[in-house]
């Protein structure tokens, strides 16, 4: 018997999950998304409209109204992915089996809103996806399923998000059915090894040329596409979205050659994709056509 569920999600990470549930014949009674900009549809909104699933924007909906609507749906479960809103206890307890979150890390490491970016920034070699039954804490609920994934040196926030969302889609689809049929159980989440993943700030994404080339690459990858790793050059903020490590040395922050190789605390990096303020992202060759600098200059 297909499970009757609601889906709560907003960003790109949520789309493969709702797509998998839809294709696996879950009965998605309602989709909820959070969108403060009425002129731009969220990725989940787009999917809901394409598949003719009723969709509500909760940005302008109070908790009482949301609960009453959930109550009337008589759901067996709610799946929550990259939603952007904390659910009250009465909503968490309303569905027959509960509310389940697809989280982009191997919990309890990186509880919080930015687990994928934090895992890259910290230099983790491995991360994962965890399905938890939600409680009132921040990613503290019991674990339904988890699966690890390798972080490649080339992984950006976007590529790792894509990888983990596919894993999460498989995990939730398979294990939610198992739970409803009493073929699996929940496991209490450990507290040992807990870390917290707060949102990456613009100040954190500023490149510190005193640090190693590897660390700078992690900042670039974790900040791609948002907020974008950046540096100042003659008063202008320039963002780097992709770069490579180069085996050259020099004082940190010095432009070493005509290809804009910049020295770091050890070795150097060469940007591959950059963006000037208010301009579009360009590859290094096109960028250099309109960007003048002098070899030997120090970047702020």
Regions picked out by a protein language model, each given a short descriptive name:
Residues 210-300:
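An anion-binding loop in the catalytic cleft
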């Amino acid at each position: 018997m297909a499970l009757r569920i609601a889906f709560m999600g907003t960003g790109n990470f949520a789309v493969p999950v709702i797509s998998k549930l839809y294709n696996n014949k879950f009965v998605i009674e309602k989709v909820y998304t959070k969108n403060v900009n009425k002129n731009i549809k969220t990725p989940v909104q787009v999917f809901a409209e394409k598949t003719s699933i009723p969709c509500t924007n909760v940005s302008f909906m109070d908790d009482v109204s949301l609960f009453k609507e959930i109550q009337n749906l008589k759901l067996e479960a709610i799946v929550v992915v990259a939603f952007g809103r904390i659910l009250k206890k009465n909503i968490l307890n309303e569905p027959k089996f509960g509310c389940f979150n697809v989280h982009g890390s191997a919990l309890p490491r990186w509880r919080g809103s930015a687990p994928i970016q934090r895992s890259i920034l910290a230099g983790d070699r491995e991360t994962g996806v965890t399905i938890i039954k939600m409680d009132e804490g921040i990613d503290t609920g019991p674990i339904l399923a988890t699966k690890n994934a390798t972080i490649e040196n080339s992984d950006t926030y976007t590529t790792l998000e894509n990888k983990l969302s596919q894993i999460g889609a498989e995990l939730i689809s398979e294990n939610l059915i198992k739970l409803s049929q009493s073929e699996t159980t929940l496991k209490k989440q450990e507290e040992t090894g807990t870390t917290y993943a707060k949102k990456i700030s613009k100040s954190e994404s500023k490149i510190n040329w005193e640090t190693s080339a590897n660390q700078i690459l992690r900042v670039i990858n974790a900040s791609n596409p948002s907020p974008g790793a950046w540096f100042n050059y003659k008063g202008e903020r320039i963002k780097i979205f992709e770069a490579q490590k180069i085996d050259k040395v020099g004082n940190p922050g010095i432009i070493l050659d005509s290809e804009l190789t910049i020295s770091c605390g050890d070795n150097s990096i060469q940007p591959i994709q950059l963006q000037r303020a208010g301009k579009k992202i360009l590859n290094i060759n096109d960028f250099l056509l309109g960007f003048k600098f002098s070899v030997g200059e120090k970047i702020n």
